[in-house]
Amino acid sequence: MFERSDAQRMLTIKKWSYPLFWAIMLPLLPLTALIGREAGTQDYWAWGLYFVVFGIIPILDYIIGKDPSNPDEITEVPSLNEERIYRIFTLLMVPIWFGALFWAGWVFVNNDYSWFGMLGWIVSIGTVGGIIAINLAHELIHKDSRLETWAGGLLLSSVTYAGFKVEHVRGHHVHVSTPDDASSSRYNQSVYHFLPRAFVRNFINAWRLEKQYLERKGKKNISIHNELIWWYGISAALAVVFGLLFGWMGVVFFLGQSFFAAFALEVINYIEHYGLHRRELDNGKYERVTPAHSWNSNYLLTNIALFQLQRHSDHHAYAKRRYQVLRHYEESPQLPGGYAAMYVLALVPPLWKKVMNPRVEAYYQGEMDQLFRAGKRVNNIA
């Protein structure tokens, strides 16, 4: 049994583990670049951080274990919400990320990589971008503070994925776990079937949602009031700056890391709602979102790395809750690993289905006829 004193101790550990994790992880970038250059094996070391995230962290997750603790709603949550350190840290990561991104662009054009090393460096930086830029933006864009939502938009612009700011809040959170949501994967759907549709539909839907929003405000779509024009404009400006600083290869680097950051995000989206559905009601609408409509994971290390994104059930039930007070729901469907491990598994569809399909079927015993697959109910499953 997890005692209250253990929960309080875990809150203290996590409070300082968020900055400590990144104080350890970010220096690995210059370390791998330096070791590779000195040893003449820079092409292999370029993949170093990618290997750490998806090779070492899953192992450490299983060694360190899970964190089932929740802050007390009466005695702890109010004070946790008021502690500025949590907010300050997320905002400080914005200039840190931009500094790391420009430094990484310099390394890309000066480290004498072969095509293999270039790809490895782009993938490694894109992975960091997926965690810092997109994941932190995800935390920030849900907040009421204009500073935080703008910081989130700026982070998304750094990976050319500004549509997420609009579509995620106004689209995904409204239609999650229904056929109307491109970011909710279907039962038995592979990640490679899911990704192209997610990229295209979410991009189109972001512009459609922004247009509808502006029309309700009585403003023109193609105007200075359209925030997507501003955020994508910043992305274009960043691409130009990378080109001026580092030549055309700088632009290749900027766009490449953007793609792999967005790729990482959508793979995580695939994992978070795989096979889950909201029941259709008699009036044709869907039941309200609850913690039952997202996969939960309590592996401590990955939760620290991702600002408790893995407590996704609580996030969807209460989208404005800050990361430090997100809760674990034992009754939510539980992933067998942390996101880092599940990411690797998702890239191998036969293994993914072997592990996850039985879990979906067990969770929905007696309701398999309600499942959705690529927008259609799966009626041929017993």
Predicted regions mapped to residue ranges:
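Juxtamembrane membrane-interface segments at transmembrane alpha-helix termini
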Residues: 57-68, 131-137, 162-165, 264-273
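Short alpha-helical catalytic segment bearing the HExxH-like zincin motif
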Residues: 131-135, 254, 304, 308, ...
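Alpha-helical bilayer-embedded segments of polytopic membrane proteins, i.e.
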Residues: 11-62, 84-109, 116-130, 224-269, ...
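Membrane-helix interface/capping segments
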Residues: 62-79, 277
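Intramembrane catalytic core of multi-pass membrane enzymes that act on lipidic substrates
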Residues: 73-196
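Short membrane-interface loop/juxtamembrane segments of multi-pass integral membrane proteins
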Residues: 71-86, 208-215, 318
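Juxtamembrane transmembrane-helix termini
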Residues: 67-70, 107-110, 141, 275, ...
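Cytosolic/stromal cytosol-facing helical appendages immediately following the last transmembrane segment
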Residues: 2-30, 148, 153, 157-227, ...
